[in-house]
Amino acid sequence: MTRTTPPNSAAPIAGGGTKPPLGVQLRDVLETANTPFRHVQDLLRFPISEARMRRRIREQLARGAPILVYSATKTASTAVAAALDRTPGIETVKVHHLQPEHFWAGPLSSPVAADGMLRHRAIEQRAARELLLQDSDQPLKVVAVMRDPIAFNLSNYTYFGRAYWMRHFWRRAPWMSTATLFDHFRATFPHTSSSLWWTHEFATTTGIDVFREGFHTSRGWQRYQRGRFDCMVLRADIDDREKRSALAEWLDCDVAPVERENANDQQAAPGVYERLKEAMRAEPEYIDAMLALPSAQTFFNAAQRDALRAKWLR
C-alpha cells in the first residue's frame, strides 16, 4: 500500500528522513552543471524532430485539412486530441503556442515571456505556424480547452518542474517542506498565464476575443467563427461525455469517447502536487485573485466560481 505524506511533512512519499540521500543531492547538482550540454544536445536534435513534424503536417494537408487542437499546456487538450485521432477520417495537429514570442528556446533562456506568459517548446510549433497559418488561407477547424486557473497553475508548476521551475532541486523536492515549495511556486510561476493565453495566443491567432464575445457558462462549451477559423472552445471540467457530444455536434459526425490522458502523476516530483493542493486550502487570497482573472470571469458564472472557491478551500 502506498503511504501518503502528511501535507506539512518534509519526508518523501517512500520513507526516509527529512534530508535527501547524498545521491539525490548530487544528481541535482549535476543537473545544473549539465545545462550547457543539454542546450547543445537540444540544438542538434530539435531541428531533426521539427523537420519530421513538418513532413507529417504536409502529409496531413495532402489528405485534407487536419483539426488544430490549440490549447494552453495542461488543459486536458491531449484527451480531446486523442479522441479525435481515434475517430475515423479525422486527424489532428496538437500545439500549445503559435506566437513566436512564446516559443521557449531551451534551458539557457527564461520560461516566461515578456508579456508574462508561460513559454513552451515543442516540435509542432514552428511547423504548425508555417504550414497552417502563414502558408495557407484554407478554412481551419480549431479546438481549445479552458481549465480553471488554480488547477492550471499547480499542474504546470509540477508537471514541468523538472524542465523549468524545479530544475535545480527537482529530485530533492519530495524532502523539502511544503511551505518552502509553496513559497517557490508563488515567487517563480507566471500565475496569470492561463488567462493571458486567450489574449496573446488565441485572439492574436484567430482574431476571436472570447472575453469580449462571451461564453455559454452553463453549457460549458461554445462555437466561435471568424474568417477562416471555425473554433470549438470547451471547458475542461465538463463531463467527458458532454465534450464528446459537443465535438460531435460541431463536426456533424460521431466522435470517439474522450478519455483521460497524460496524467500529471507520472511527471511531477512524487507527492508535490498533492502537498501544494493541500496547502492551497490556506490561501483564500490567492484563490480569489485567480478567480478574478478575465478567463475565470468569462468561462465561469458567479455560482460556478463560488463552487470552485469552495472546492479549493475544502
Regions picked out by a protein language model, each given a short descriptive name:
Residues T5-R314:
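Membrane-interface amphipathic segments in extracytoplasmic regions
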Residues M1-T2:
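Terminal amphipathic alpha-helical/low-complexity segments used for targeting or macromolecular assembly
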